[in-house]
Amino acid sequence: MTRYFCTYFDRNYLTRGLALYRSLRQACPSFDLWVLCLDTVCYRVLLQLQLPGMHLIPLEELEQNDRQLCAAKGNRSLLEYYFTCSPCLPTFVLNHHVYVDRITYLDADLYFFRDPSDLFDEIEHSSIAIIPHRFHPTFLDREQFGIYNVGWVSFRRDESGMACLSKWREQCLDWCY
């Protein structure tokens, strides 16, 4: 079964993004990875590499397809803007690729040491998969930044999954700084 992932990075995270890709190549039998290239250097390097299963999305393409995202660019820092892209990217993939039944957003600095099939088996009937931070009591003050880690977030193309993704996108567009 083909797994569908998306991530984003710029030239500063290019090596991490490539490590994520290579770990997927070794651990996941069949996958597609959409990469939102946050700068032209990243896009050009990945375009030259022509990696199988990797699909490139220049930032400009996402912005042209999401006017609300583009409008948000003017009221936040570059890093905050990148974070705002987190729900917009899986939305874009689902809107443009109707065969994708579940999209999983991954932070670019993740690395797979084994096949993620067990994880997908566990969430097989779930519309949404999200991981709580599970802060150690010493770090509970960090809950002010959120109780969930968005490093791995998965959405099924069904009513609940799409509604949750849409709500997350709206909330990030309203406030992500």
Label every PLM stretch briefly.
Residues 1-177:
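Glycosyltransferase catalytic domains, chiefly GT-A lineage
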